[in-house]
Amino acid sequence: MHHARNVQFSNIHVSTVDEDVRPDFVEVDTKGWGDQGDGTYRNPXSDPDVIRVGNKXYMVASDFHXMGMQVLESDDMVXWRYISQIYRRFNEPGWDANLHYAGGSWAPSIRYHSGLFYVYFCTPDEGLYMSTASNPAGPWAPLHLVKRVAKWEDPCPFWDEDGQAYIGRSQHGAGPIIVHRMSADGKTLLDEGKTVYEGPIAEGTKFMKRNGWYYLIIPEGGVGTGWQTVLRARNIYGPYERRIVLEQGSTGVNGPHQGALVDAPDGSWWFYHFQETPVLGRVVHLQPARWEADWPVIGVDYDKNGIGEPVATWKKPVSSVGTAGFQTCDDSNDALGLHWQWNHNPVDTHWNLTDRKGWLTLKAMPADSLKMVRNMLTQKVVGYQSESTTKVSIKGDSYAGLFCSGKLFCGVGLCKDGVFIEFGGQRKIIDKGSYQEVWFKVTNDCEQNRHLFYYSIDGEHYQPAGSAFAMSGGYWKGIRVGCLTTFLQAKRLLRARHLRMLNSTISIKNSPNSLADC
């Protein structure tokens, strides 16, 4: 069994500077993240979709093999908090055996219609799914399978003024864009769909209508190298006019595309998109937008070629509403904090929060490698520099501790023979001894791509566990950290105490536009 308590993040420390450069700009340290002095953006996500209902904005994003699509809420469109989870397990073959890395939810869409919030997503192998809720904080209805089909992706629903429902989507292999009619409740497709556009790696469909124009807001050109395209037509089936509205240009933001065009309460417009990075994964950015001749203009056209480029910093959409700290699960004995995610489906018979009040219990199960360990509990890395620690004690032949995952799965932990490290499926004892308890730590420097495990016998003096190593994102996700326990033969007992995911102090001179993602 694995006991954990006091799961928490530390606050990011922020200091302000004068906004005296230009009316719309502030000078910032671009290594910082999130809000400027009066709010912090935490734990964002890839392939974002955002809507605004009233004075609040809501975000969903791809979660792939992690359970199970978090919903985030914001008062100012910059600082976000988790408020719910759409599903907690995926009841399809292979999801109880860690067989669907890079599968699961791809590029969801969230919409609000007639008093209900709707979320749609496709999976590579299983089909098109949707769920609804009257309150975005949940509960969300059980997943409804709209169509059993493979290789669809990136769906987005749309309800026209006459009540007719549609859904746009793309196909694996990046296109074409196809539009279907749906039943009014959004649960049934009414036709086989009509192709309305073909383009270079056209995907990520987002529908909207404004001033009588139907818009398809789509990325093209590929994840790491693409651009943002907008299509418009007077008829939902076209013909569509095309315009490129955002590109990398002279900036360092590669592939600035795929996201959501959203208006703020004051009527200003904004565009969320992601940027693929090699270690952190897909990093969310927010661009200013406006309309000219019924075309969206996004970012700033620095080279005057008619196409916007990402800005480094910009005035916030909504004035500050106060700083929000990192979310933890310390304030509840009834549920894990929403920032925690299981890798694939959890085995509910092998974890609980009831064996000891305020503690998490994980029961060890056999696995051939770290990648295949069941009940692997993970969370996103926060920012470029972070630190995570846990305290572990064991009985029997269990292996347990702290791990990092991406393309590589590696970890440090405790077994009956002492402290071990594991890389590439090879487990090595680095400190022999019969320890009752050991503290473990990992530091993640995603800017230098330098990561290092540590261990401590007293919780104060740490020494390296092996050498520094490089990491890269994998299976469409950035690197993650978490805790696990496993055994090779018979069931054993693990006790891990004072588990806490502790973000290191990050001094932010001011708020950049980059919104961190893993």
Curated annotation (Swiss-Prot):
Enzyme nomenclature, EC number: 3.2.1.37
Reactions catalysed: Hydrolysis of (1->4)-beta-D-xylans, to remove successive D-xylose residues from the non-reducing termini
GO biological process: carbohydrate metabolic process
Domain of life: Bacteria
Site (Important for catalytic activity, responsible for pKa modulation of the active site Glu and correct orientation of both the proton donor and substrate): D154
Alphabetically ordered keywords of this record: Carbohydrate metabolism, Glycosidase, Hydrolase
GO molecular function term, any single one: xylan 1,4-beta-xylosidase activity
Name this protein carries in UniProt: Putative beta-xylosidase
Species of provenance: Xylanibacter ruminicola
